[in-house]
UniProtKB/Swiss-Prot annotation:
GO terms for cellular component: cytosol. Belongs to the SmpB family. This is SsrA-binding protein. It comes from Bacillus mycoides (strain KBAB4). Pfam families: SmpB. Required for rescue of stalled ribosomes mediated by trans-translation. Binds to transfer-messenger RNA (tmRNA), required for stable association of tmRNA with ribosomes. tmRNA and SmpB together mimic tRNA shape, replacing the anticodon stem-loop with SmpB. tmRNA is encoded by the ssrA gene; the 2 termini fold to resemble tRNA(Ala) and it encodes a 'tag peptide', a short internal open reading frame. During trans-translation Ala-aminoacylated tmRNA acts like a tRNA, entering the A-site of stalled ribosomes, displacing the stalled mRNA. The gene is smpB.
Amino acid sequence: MPKGTGKVIAQNKKAFHDYFIEETYEVGLVLQGTEIKSIRAGRVNLKDAFARIHNGEVWVHNMHINTYEQGNRFNHDPLRTRKLLLHKKEIDKLAGYAKETGYALVPVRIYLKNGFAKMALGLAKGKKQYDKRHDLKEKEAKREIARVFRDRQKM
């Protein structure tokens, strides 16, 4: 994350399991009033979210922001597509990568920075099944080593 970032609200752990994240970009979100209140309450899910470029604009799909509990008839649709704010050069660069096969734009995390909701958008390349298995084996080996060291310290 860039310097000066604030509180992390939600992370997309599935993105790190399914993709190699090559680059991340800090992007702004265009939100309605009840959406930012729900985000501050931590009621957001990035699990199946993805971003697409359409007519020179970046849009995030399937990002679920629960309705605000104290909201009334002006509450938002939880799964609506939301516009992301990037510089034109960044959009052009991402559009070039997104046209290549195997690349996707995936939300990595949502956080608050200076009172504004920001998203870390990752340029991701899909993992194969054997890559996922290899990562799980490495993770399990690290856990086992940490467990052995922890047991030795207790003795």
